[in-house]
Amino acid sequence: MSKKINKIVLAYSGGLDTSVILKWLQEQYQCEVVTFTADIGQGEEVEPARAKAKLLGIKEENIFIKDLKEEFVRDYVFPMFRANTLYEGEYLLGTSIARPLIAKHLVEIAKEVGADAISHGATGKGNDQVRFELGGYALMPDVKVVAPWREWDLNSREKLLAYAEKHGIPIEKKGKKSPYSMDANLLHISYEGGILEDPASEPEEDMWRWSVSPLDAPDAPERITIEFERGDAVGINGVKMSPATLLAELNRLGGKHGIGRLDLVENRYVGMKSRGCYETPGGTILLKAHRAIESLTLDREETHLKDEMMPRYASLIYNGYWFSPERRALQALIDETQKNVTGSVGLKLYKGNVILAGRTSERSLFNTAYSTFEEDSVYNQKDAEGFIKLNALRFIIAGKANPS
């Protein structure tokens, strides 16, 4: 420890890890600790974190609990989905996209209460430490970051439990503990650890929390319609919904039909491969629908440019660069392409599948007069001859210069 820290804002869940961190910060840094708990749709009550923080000596005015579900979906999830974002071709970035939001509010609270440091419970082996800290430095350049997992020797659950018992930290006993490390928000739930550390092992069926097995899903497809305005989903089956309400409803529908399960070995930013399983039912449906409405409303070169940029954009989010100038620049371009992405998409949900069932838009670029296979009066097929010859010119020149 170099310069004295006066006040720390801790990203606090109320669980074992962050409760131990809270006490450890008080002991090691001898400073005031402020707790921040975010409700981003993880499905657990967040208010118990208030009582637990009080029990550990945190003043009422230093306990912050915020409902961020609408902000999360509106300002983070939806902008990401405008790009049809997938990391390494599969991952919908459910964990990655939540971290900049938490970092933003950590910094806002730090400025509000006059804190000079922030702290988080991410380990020194994962991506989250990078995401939290890059966000912190981008928004508060002089902030100090305390990452206990990189400092202490409490590197096992047994040691954490022993520390908690020694310091009177209450540990909830909820029956049999899950063998998996789980992280949830409105976009997804992730599973790591346990038998998943062996890539050859198949996940157990009772691991999945949000979805039924596709084998056990209803035998009849369910039809839905999603309405879009300027690239964002705004309603389901003609009913307007807020962003968070809409995503929650898509999660319910997708989970009912076994949609959105993913078993992935991914390349972490810190250099290692990791295996995780994800449930993203609503996001899986939303991605399919968004691509469908774009197919009607985007120009060809806009579509291809977006597809070329998407892997770079996805990596920026995965690696923690949400607040970077390059991500903002890409976002501006992506958002510009969405001004005509308005219309509706019909889907059938059936046993793990999202099946397109029609799309329509008043801004559609699909012109039957040109694309029909029947006789038309607007397209002169003879024009194609010159088009082809001009595009073939370089091949003709090269072939004559270098005959095979």
UniProtKB/Swiss-Prot annotation:
Residues binding L-aspartate, per UniProt: 123, 127-128
Pfam family, one: Arginosuc_syn_C
Subunit structure: Homotetramer.
UniProt GO MF annotations: argininosuccinate synthase activity; ATP binding
Keywords on record: Amino-acid biosynthesis, Arginine biosynthesis, ATP-binding, Cytoplasm, Ligase, Nucleotide-binding
Protein name: Argininosuccinate synthase
PROSITE patterns hit by this protein: ARGININOSUCCIN_SYN_1, ARGININOSUCCIN_SYN_2
Gene name as annotated: argG
Binding site for L-citrulline: 91, 96, 127, 131, 181, 190, 266, 278
Provenance organism: Wolinella succinogenes (strain ATCC 29543 / DSM 1740 / CCUG 13145 / JCM 31913 / LMG 7466 / NCTC 11488 / FDC 602W) (Vibrio succinogenes)
